[in-house]
Design a protein with these regions (language model features):
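A short beta-loop-alpha structural element at the N-terminal edge
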Residues: 2-16
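Helix-loop element at the rim of GNAT/NAT acetyltransferase active sites that forms part
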Residues: 18-31, 38
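Cytosolic beta-strand hydrophobic patch enriched in CBS
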Residues: 46-52
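Conserved catalytic-core motifs of GNAT/GCN5-like acyltransferases
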Residues: 68-71, 131, 141, 146-162
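Conserved acetyl-CoA-binding loop-helix of GNAT-fold acetyltransferases
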Residues: 99, 105-118
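Conserved GNAT acetyl-CoA-binding A-motif
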Residues: 113, 120-133
Length: 174
């Protein structure tokens, strides 16, 4: 499968909302309006995976997004309030890493994560943070993330784990 990773654009939001709805339960998924607010506030923090079609690239099959923040862990308010975004924030947060079901296990999620890690390094961030469910801890550890334990976040009524990747501490495998 041929695909490319590119910067997200405001005109992608409807497609991103469809991908998000396919990847997360309704209580956890960001809706189109929320994604539009995020894209407007921090477009530089969105990357999309686009599959090559007969007419060229165009079908969005995945994306990654999050705000730049000063905190080392994600709090629930960050998902709804774009005011937490700081252009010079110490950490790149990851609110979602989404790949449609039929395109999973083909390296798309890893390519998106590696692009976000590369971008955070280029911007001089101290590292990246995210929350994940217990079944995904091992996946994120492959990128150098460290598990900080159960998160204070109860987003969507789920149990989340705080993960951090800190550059310059021997954990950077990006």
């Amino acid at each position: 499968m041929a695909y490319q990773i590119r910067q997200g654009r405001l005109e992608d939001v409807t497609d991103l909302a469809e991908v998000e709805a396919a990847c997360f339960p309704a209580a956890e998924a960001a809706d189109e309006e929320s994604l539009k607010e995020r894209m407007t506030a921090f477009p530089e923090c969105f990357f999309v995976a686009e599959e090559k079609t007969e007419d060229g690239f165009g079908k969005i099959i995945g994306f990654i997004n999050g705000a730049d923040v000063d905190q080392q862990t994600i709090c629930d308010e960050m998902f709804e309030d774009t005011g937490w975004h700081k252009k010079d924030g110490r950490y790149q947060s990851i609110f979602g890493l989404d790949v449609i079901g039929s395109k999973r296990r083909q390296g798309v999620a890893a390519a998106l994560m590696n692009r976000m890690i590369e971008d955070a390094k280029e911007k001089g961030r101290a590292g990246l943070i995210l929350t994940c469910k217990d079944r995904l801890i091992h996946y994120y550890e492959k990128f150098g993330y460290r598990n900080l334990g159960v998160s204070a976040s109860v987003h969507g009524g789920a149990v989340w784990y705080d993960m951090i990747l800190e550059f310059g501490k021997g954990q950077d495998k990006g």
